[in-house]
UniProtKB/Swiss-Prot annotation:
This is DNA repair protein RecO. GO terms for biological process: DNA recombination; double-strand break repair. GO terms for cellular component: bacterial nucleoid. Involved in DNA repair and RecF pathway recombination. The gene is recO. It comes from Legionella pneumophila subsp. pneumophila (strain Philadelphia 1 / ATCC 33152 / DSM 7513). Gene3D superfamilies: Nucleic acid-binding proteins, Recombination protein O, C-terminal domain. It holds the Pfam family RecO_C.
Length: 229
């Protein structure tokens, strides 16, 4: 039996029996894990086992199953409402459906924390969308699915600002095509410049296709609430 202490966020919760809860936690130390919380239905634990509360969790591993020993909040629940709330639900669903269990990625954990704090403070929808696009890119990198915004996918030639390109999921950007994106937009996105609405619109179009490819047909329910991606 081994014990670990983790920085964690609740991504999904399902009641189990009369007293317990099955949790999917996103942790800095272990990545996404499945964990059984005995006594999870008690009022104290129910108040903690919610999305958007930063947690410190002590777990033990027995026979390839994680069990919680102790759970504490490290801060109050993030104040998410409206577009911010739907966006938080969206990125939680992305983690739920795309990450393999027990595969830690501290950079992605930091990106998640940065995004949640950012959308909690954001006042404009465009600011929220820019944060979501950056998180989606961090997730794609963590899952090993990246592509170049600087080079044409089939020839390797540099993206030209005045040319137009088509995004092909699984490949990258191809010169010409039906749904064309200005090279200027690709270079701006590569430089993390989402300050103009046209650049942000192109980033949204690209990331939606890339994320859909990563999801492999699985539906993100939060999109029907807000449509952030």
């Amino acid at each position: 039996m081994t014990s670990k202490s983790l920085n964690a966020w609740v991504i999904h919760k399902q009641w189990s029996g009369d007293t317990s809860a099955r949790l999917k936690l996103f942790t800095r130390e272990l990545g996404l894990i499945n964990c059984l919380c005995k006594g999870g239905r008690t009022p104290k634990k129910q108040s903690l086992l919610q999305a958007f509360i930063p947690l410190w969790v002590s777990i033990e591993e027995r026979y390839d199953q994680y069990y919680t020993r102790n759970i504490e909040s490290t801060s109050s629940r993030l104040d998410l409402e409206g577009h911010s709330l739907f966006s938080g639900l969206y990125i939680n669903e992305l983690l739920y459906y795309t990450l393999s269990p027990d595969f830690p990625d501290p950079d992605l954990f930091d990106a998640y924390l940065f995004t949640l704090n950012g959308i909690a403070l954001a006042r404009e929808r465009e600011a929220i969308e820019a944060l979501l696009r950056r998180f989606e890119w961090a997730l794609l990198k963590a899952c090993g699915y990246t592509f170049s915004f600087l080079h044409e996918a089939r020839t390797g030639e540099l993206i030209v600002p005045d040319s137009y390109y088509q995004f092909v999921a699984g490949e990258g950007f191809i010169l010409g095509g039906d749904k064309e994106i200005p090279g200027e937009h690709l270079l701006a996105i590569a430089a993390d410049n989402l300050s103009e609405s046209a650049y942000l619109k192109s980033a949204k179009f690209i990331m939606r296709q890339a994320i859909n490819h990563l999801l492999g047909g699985r539906e993100i329910k939060a999109r029907s609430l807000y449509g952030p991606a």
